[in-house]
């Protein structure tokens, strides 16, 4: 084994409410009627091409999967994503663990995002009690019912919000 084995007894989960979160949902959530940011011609061409491919796929009854990283949620595009799903443009989603963490934290606490540099240095990065507890509780409960990660966590977020 390379390095030192982690002593799990030394990990002390901390209350999420005490974390200095860097963004609130109100600060980052992009309204559906917001004016799109200006982008260059090359990028706009890529967006147009992608939109055309999505339209063609859906017109032909094909599935469209969107695979995205945490920054989509972290930077406030949740309503846009929800709208694409609700209107049938996207049929499947895939993200990483950080994407689901931001989604859950915004829904539960109304804020998310921590300073990686500071919190890694203090050994507190990712040690937030409620985030770990409730996401894993949702996954366990959903797993018992035969649900996958996304369905189980989505049900938990939609039906068991703190507020």
Predicted feature residues:
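Metabolite-binding pocket within alpha/beta catalytic cores that recognizes anionic/polar moieties
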Residues: 2-40, 48-150
